[in-house]
C-alpha cells in the first residue's frame, strides 16, 4: 500500500509491501518522525538509507543527484540458472527472429513447458521492474507459454543471455526537469498467428522510464493509421490514470507541476489527425469507440499529440 501524510515541510510518502517499507520525505527529520510513529504501534527495524527493496537495488548518487534502480543479482541468477552465464549479446531479440515468431506447427520439436514458463516468468518480472529494454522481446514470447517450441525457447535464451550480459543496466532518475515525456508506436499486423498489431509506449519522468508496455492490440487493425490510433488510445488511458493518481496523492503542486496538456509523441500523421478531429472518413468509420478515448481527452485539453 501507499500512504500520504502532510508533514510540516511537505508531503511524506510511505510505501509498504508485506513486511518491507520505504519512506520518502523532503528532510531526514520528517522521515525519522514517521518511522518513529510507526514504531510506536508496530515492532519494526529501521534499515537506514535504502539499498534494496524486493530484490531491486537502489543506488543513490548525492553528488550527481540521481537515483538508479536495477536488478543485477537477479539478472545474473537468471542467466546462471538458464546455463548462459558469461555469454554476451548486444540485443534481446533480432528483428528476424521477432518477425518470424508463430505458434508451433505439427512435427516441430517442442521445448519443456515448465522450464520455459519458469524462465519466462523471471524475465517478465525483470522487464516489469527495471528492464523496459526487454519488454518487446519478452512479451512477444509470452503467448507461446502453453506450447513452446524449441524455436521459442532458443529465442528466450537469447533474451536471458542479453539480460545476463547487461546485468548492471537500470533506470536512472536525475535532475532533469519533471516534464512528462510520453511516446507511443505500433507495429502493424506483426503477429503472424492473428495478424494483430502490437502497441508500444513509454512514459518518462525526471529522465527515466516510469511506465511502459508492449502488448498485442485487442482488435485487428486494417491500416497503419488504425494501429497507431489504437496505440494513442492505450497510452492516453495510462497517462490519464497516472495523473489522477498523482492528484489523489496531492503531488500536483508547486514542486510537482504539470501545466497545460500533456504531450504524447506519435509518428503517424493520419492517427494524429484522427485524435484531433471528429471527422471519420470511410477508412475510419469502423474503428471501435473504445479507441476514441484519446480524442476525448485531446478535446478536453488534458492531452495533446505531437508528431
Give, region by region, the residue ranges found by the protein language model.
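Long, low-complexity, charge-biased intrinsically disordered regions
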Residues: 1-307
Amino acid at each position: 500500500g501507499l500512504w500520504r501524510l502532510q508533514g510540516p515541510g511537505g508531503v511524506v510518502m510511505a510505501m509498504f509491501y508485506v513486511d518491507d517499507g520505504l519512506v520518502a520525505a523532503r528532510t531526514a527529520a520528517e522521515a525519522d518522525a514517521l518511522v518513529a510513529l510507526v514504531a510506536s504501534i508496530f515492532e519494526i527495524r529501521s534499515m537506514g538509507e535504502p539499498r534494496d527493496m524486493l530484490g531491486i537495488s537502489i543506488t543513490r548518487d548525492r553528488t550527481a543527484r540521481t537515483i538508479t534502480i536495477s536488478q543485477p543479482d537477479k539478472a545474473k541468477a537468471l542467466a546462471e540458472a538458464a546455463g548462459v552465464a558469461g555469454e554476451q549479446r548486444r540485443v534481446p531479440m533480432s528483428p528476424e527472429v521477432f518477425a518470424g515468431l508463430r505458434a508451433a506447427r505439427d512435427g516441430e520439436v517442442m521445448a519443456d513447458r515448465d522450464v520455459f514458463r519458469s524462465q519466462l516468468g523471471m524475465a517478465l518480472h525483470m522487464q516489469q521492474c527495471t528492464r523496459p529494454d526487454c519488454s518487446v522481446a519478452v512479451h512477444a514470447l509470452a503467448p507461446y507459454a502453453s506450447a513452446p517450441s524449441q524455436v521459442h525457447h532458443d529465442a528466450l535464451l537469447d533474451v536471458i543471455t542479453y539480460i545476463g550480459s547487461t546485468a548492471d543496466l537500470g533506470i536512472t532518475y536525475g535532475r532533469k526537469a519533471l516534464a512528462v515525456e510520453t511516446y507511443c508506436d505500433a507495429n502493424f499486423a506483426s503477429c503472424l498467428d492473428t495478424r494483430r498489431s502490437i502497441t508500444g509506449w513509454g512514459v518518462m519522468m525526471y529522465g527515466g522510464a516510469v511506465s511502459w508496455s508492449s502488448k498485442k492490440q485487442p482488435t485487428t487493425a486494417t491500416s497503419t493509421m488504425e494501429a497507431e490510433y489504437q496505440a494513442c488510445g492505450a497510452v492516453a488511458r495510462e497517462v490519464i490514470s497516472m495523473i489522477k493518481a498523482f492528484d489523489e496523492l496531492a503531488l500536483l503542486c508547486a514542486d510537482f507541476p504539470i501545466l497545460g496538456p500533456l504531450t504524447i509523441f506519435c509518428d503517424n500523421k493520419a492517427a494524429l489527425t484522427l485524435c484531433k478531429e471528429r471527422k471519420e472518413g470511410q477508412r475510419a468509420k469502423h474503428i471501435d469507440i473504445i479507441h476514441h478515448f484519446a480524442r476525448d481527452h485531446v478535446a478536453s485539453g488534458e492531452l495533446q499529440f505531437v508528431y
